[in-house]
A protein has these predicted regions:
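Fungal secretory targeting signals
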Residues: 1-25
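Serine-esterase "nucleophile elbow" of acetyl-processing enzymes
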Residues: 20-67, 82-90, 94, 110-116
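Short, solvent-exposed loop/turn segments at secondary-structure boundaries
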Residues: 43-46, 75-76, 167-172
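Structural motif
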Residues: 71-80
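Short, flexible loop/turn segments with low-complexity composition
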Residues: 246-262
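Acidic helix-start/capping segments at beta-turn-to-alpha-helix junctions
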Residues: 67-72, 164
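Alpha-helical cap/lid subdomain in secreted, periplasmic
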Residues: 83-227, 231, 238-250
């Protein structure tokens, strides 16, 4: 082979090794989950979080960073949102779902999780540490901005309901934090932040299932479901995403088909 032919072959090989061909598909996003025990993996055999099952219904990888006992405030103060921001890459998707542990008042026997009342820039002071505490909406907005700055898109998800049949009659009134996720989304006014009403999706499913079937999903208490209940909650979440219950989200295109319909 002539020297010129050899050099040409080597040059072509170098280009092929270093180029990023247009025909290669873009990197698939990873879904990160931020939440409390209703989303997190549990070591208790009587309960589990829905975040452990959602990967069954998606065609992308899922990283569940939810942890029990956390609120929007404590997840922020403990640096857990920052940890997720350090992990995400541009194009990844993050679901943020809190509310169960945000109740109470920092002004009265503050437990480090309660948020200040209000839906904006209101503040209050912890009666135990002197910490300035902010509202649920404030913490959600700060977390969303942090993650958006890293190139991730954010889905603000309303908290799952408790057992709405616990009294034997249907009680579907949502927690005050359910509409606050939408408030935060609207305040951000960012196309990269969307909202899904997970609470409403699960509520519709519970109405359809009835008191006996729903009661069987709550073994430990009326907040945490069994593994079977967590799986159903994940299916309700995916159905809401796929059917664009509250508009489109970047996760919709990564839902496996056919979609299981649970409500």
């Amino acid at each position: 082979m002539k020297l010129s032919s050899i050099l040409a072959s080597l040059a072509l090989a170098t280009v092929q090794a270093t180029a990023r061909p247009a025909e290669l598909a873009a990197r698939a996003p990873t879904l990160f989950l931020c939440g409390d025990s209703t989303m997190a993996r549990s070591s208790d055999s009587q309960m589990d979080g829905w975040g452990q099952y959602v990967s069954k219904y998606l065609n992308i990888a899922v990283v569940n960073r939810a942890i029990g006992g956390r609120s929007s405030r404590s997840f922020w103060n403990e640096g857990r949102f920052q940890n997720v921001a350090n992990e995400v890459k541009a194009g990844d998707i993050v679901v943020i779902e809190f509310g169960h542990n945000d109740v109470g008042s920092p002004r009265s026997n503050d437990n480090g999780r309660s948020v200040c009342s209000g839906q904006g820039a209101e503040t209050c002071v912890s009666d135990t540490t002197g910490e300035t505490v902010y509202t649920f909406v404030y913490y959600i907005i700060q977390a969303s901005r942090l993650l958006r700055a890293k190139g991730a898109t954010v889905i603000l998800s309303s908290q799952t309901p408790k057992n709405q049949w616990s009294t034997g009659a249907w009680v579907g009134t949502p927690s005050r934090f359910v509409p606050m996720q939408l408030t935060a989304k609207d305040a951000l006014n960012d196309a990269g932040v969307t909202f899904v009403d997970h609470h409403e999706a699960v509520s519709k499913m519970y109405r359809k299932l009835g008191a006996a079937a729903v009661g069987a999903l709550y073994i430990k208490d009326n907040t945490h479901t069994s593994a079977a209940g967590a799986d159903l909650s994940s299916q309700a979440f995916v159905q809401a995403i796929s059917q664009k219950m509250n508009g489109t989200t970047p996760l919709a295109e990564h839902v496996k088909t056919p979609v299981k319909l649970v409500y």
